[in-house]
Amino acid sequence: MITVATAECFTLGKIGTTIHKIASGYEECKNHRYYNIINGNVKIISSSFIPSIEGAEKLLNLGAPLPKCDYEYSYSKAYTEKNDLKVAHILAKGLKNSLNCNIAIATTAGVGRGGICIISDKNEYLFTTDIEGDLISKKNIIQRQKNGIDKTINKFVEILKKEYFL
């Protein structure tokens, strides 16, 4: 069984929840296009929505502080796209190290296309959504979120097929 954990910000834990529902055989997911790949082969060991620096540092035992935010925004992380990519990588690495899972997925997005990182047992994948968004002005954040969820799940399944031969 392939173990998976997520630390999500702009995707609000929906990647982990979706994978969990498919893996667990929820009735509403039995017609999902990836059901036959995920169900019976994958289990979510942790799925987290972590919007704050404080939460990420404490929960993931990162060993070093995350970068200071590029933008002032309530209590949530808000970075440029370049730093979103760095932070997503740090979060995924912390998650993988803390939980010793096969696949760690992390997402974060402030201003830009956001940052998504998937770390498997063999490789690290760092990418963005296809949608420019701005957490501060709330521009395109729902569209960016939906695109990020879909793109990440598609990449996750691609990794399962390529690296785990499913």
Curated annotation (Swiss-Prot):
InterPro entries: HcgF
Pfam families: HcgF
Signal sequence bounds: none
The family this protein is said to belong to: Belongs to the UPF0254 family.
Protein's UniProt name: UPF0254 protein Maeo_0668
Organism name: Methanococcus aeolicus (strain ATCC BAA-1280 / DSM 17508 / OCM 812 / Nankai-3)
